[in-house]
Amino acid sequence: MLLSLLFLLSTFAFGALTQPVPAKSENNVQFLHSKNKKRFYDYSTELIRGVNIGGWLLLEPYITPSLFEAFRTDENSDAGIPVDEYHYCEALGSEVAESRLEAHWSTFYTEQDFKNIASAGLNMVRIPIGYWAFKTLDSDPYVTGKQESYLDKAIQWSKDAGLKVWVDLHGAPGSQNGFDNSGLRDHWSFLEDENLNLTKEVIKYLLEKYSREEYLDTVIGIELINEPLGPVLDMDKLKEYYQFGYDYLRNELGSDQIVVIHDAFEAYNYWDSTLTVEDGSWGVVVDHHHYQCFSSDQLARSIDEHVSVACEWGTGVLTESHWTVAGEWSAALTDCAKWINGVGYGARYDGSFTKDSESSYYIGSCENNEDVSTWSEERKSNNRKYVEAQLDAFELRGGWIFWCYKTETTVEWDLQRLMYSGLFPQPVTDRQYPNQCGF
């Protein structure tokens, strides 16, 4: 999830393009599949239609607010409520935190969920997990060593249901972005030596384990790090980290597993010069995340403007040389979901957002936001239009992975509720508003 600092990135210009997908060429990494005859998933011909398993093995307050509401002492204030998993574990202590998290892990997702995902016409899941599941810093309060067994269960459930999997390193020590979904909010020091060294230890373990023969028919990508916040990071060091992960996989392990790199919120084609064919690289996916709800300017757009931007997300990647997938996106046209911007921050949409020097203004009401039965027909149709435009755009290239499959209370971020309410196509190819983008 792309949260509190992301509004800084909302001013990117999305220029509409009309080029077709480029012809197969040895200069395009995504087209080396046929040349190398590798067994990996061919993202140029096999479309991804997936969903994220968010808020399970790595907590996000807005996905499971009940875990965090247990700390509330004042119905009018979020004071004292942990803002992320780090502070959740710190507040409870290791024994109680482990007990509560075990109860969450064992119930929030079960095998039936993965069967339901497949039955809904999807073919892939992306599973976020934090570094602390495998190893921690001495000062970390996290519960560790327990999440991996659930990850392995999920991979087996996926295999049994006919789903493919991305294993996504979603949180790095020191945080890579300052978002609560990294485990530690308002920090971004993962490229400091101690933190980077531990990140490398963890990613080496993930690459080694999930590139083994028994996983290769199901795990079709390992994401080296989720959403590194490019504007506040040393991009040269980030590129070195990406190169490290790629080299370890190809040269040390000799594996043809797929490497997934997030775009770090850089512009289209930025990564064309990284892990290139000329350097001998292949089997690389660039992961783009797209939202229009984390700045007041975005929230104030008309539905036609929202749809136009969504369409440009599709055309914008047509000339990128790597495989590309939209690894996160949602139906959100508001930021009204409780704690979507973080515990204690409010919503820009209704003007209640405050953080540091940033304020907000009233755009619309958040009342009854999570009760679809109260929505106007116009609002329902607008959400459906927005979803369909994104589906059309993302299927111009490698496909999409919706964020996320389920939450405790939200609608715009909950694929189950959206499908049940008729706001997400079923089947996923159904269109009430065809040809919005004119592709």
UniProtKB/Swiss-Prot annotation:
Disulfide bonds: C311-C437, C336-C366
EC number: 3.2.1.58
Signal peptide: 1-18
Principal cellular location given in the protein's record: secreted
Keyword Coiled coil: no
Annotated active site: E227, E328
Keywords assigned by UniProt, alphabetized: Cell wall biogenesis/degradation, Disulfide bond, Glycosidase, Hydrolase, Secreted, Signal, Zymogen
Compartment(s): Secreted
Transmembrane intervals: none
Molecular functions per Gene Ontology: glucan exo-1,3-beta-glucosidase activity
Gene Ontology CC entries for this record: cell surface; extracellular region
Catalytic activities: Successive hydrolysis of beta-D-glucose units from the non-reducing ends of (1->3)-beta-D-glucans, releasing alpha-glucose
Family annotation (Gene3D superfamilies): Glycosidases
Primary enzyme class: hydrolase
One GO BP: glucan catabolic process
Secreted is among the record's keywords: yes
Family to which this protein belongs: Belongs to the glycosyl hydrolase 5 (cellulase A) family.
Function text: Beta-glucanases participate in the metabolism of beta-glucan, the main structural component of the cell wall. It could also function biosynthetically as a transglycosylase.
Name of this protein: Glucan 1,3-beta-glucosidase
